[in-house]
Design a protein with these regions (language model features):
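Conserved class I S-adenosyl-L-methionine
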Residues: 1-47, 50-54, 69, 128-157
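Class I SAM-dependent methyltransferase SAM/SAH-binding core
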Residues: 47-89
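A conserved beta-strand element that flanks and buttresses the S-adenosyl-L-methionine
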Residues: 101
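Short catalytic micro-motifs in class I SAM-dependent methyltransferases
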Residues: 104-107
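A short glycine-rich, Lys/Arg-flanked "PGG" loop and its adjoining helix->strand segment in the class I
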Residues: 113-125
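Short alpha-helix
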Residues: 156-171
Length: 174
């Protein structure tokens, strides 16, 4: 069963609300400040391709395990290359991307450490691994936890992280 199937079409509608527009503008400002110049971007857990449409890389690749999200992403971001795959086993050669983006992805994977190791494996030397998570004590995580407790997918499967150690390197650039 695809836990994202019921919301794939409406996934981005939230960004059009006043609060959603504010949050996404802040996220975009933060992201653009972290992203180095380069040719290639891989987004793991790309969803509907929101970031793939907005980030300035000539080669953009989205990895998404949800067939429903993948279908919407291919329609909304046809300029990107889309691959149905899981973050724990990325189907790319080592050192293939200048930037790897994991944005609200680690909450939904089975093996966080494996995903981070895979991201590091496909990252070129000097590249940037950018990770965005819903912090465990945040109001957003509390809301999604409540939805999950009520059985609302995909939040019923989400895990919220108190901290992230990037595949053996505890250094985080903020």
């Amino acid at each position: 069963m695809d836990p994202f199937a019921f919301l794939a079409e409406a996934y981005e509608a939230w960004y059009e609300t006043p609060l959603g527009a504010y949050v996404i503008a802040e996220e975009e400002r933060a992201l653009k400040g972290l992203l180095p110049p380069g040719e290639s971007l891989l987004e793991v857990g790309a969803g509907t391709g929101y970031w793939l449409r907005r980030l300035p890389y000539p080669r953009r690749v989205g990895v998404e395990p949800s067939e429903a999200m993948l279908a919407v992403g291919r329609r909304r971001a046809p300029e990107a290359t889309w691959v149905r795959a899981w973050g724990e086993a990325l189907p790319f050669s080592g050192e293939s991307f200048d930037v790897v983006l994991l944005f609200t992805t680690l909450e939904f994977v089975e093996d966080v450490e494996r995903v981070l190791l895979e991201a590091r494996r496909v990252l070129r030397p000097g590249g940037a691994l950018v990770v965005g998570v819903l912090e465990a004590l945040s109001p957003w995580a509390a809301l999604y936890r409540r939805l999950g407790e009520k059985g609302v997918l995909p939040w019923a499967r989400a895990r919220f992280l108190a901290r992230v150690v990037v595949a053996g390197d505890p250094t985080l650039q903020l």
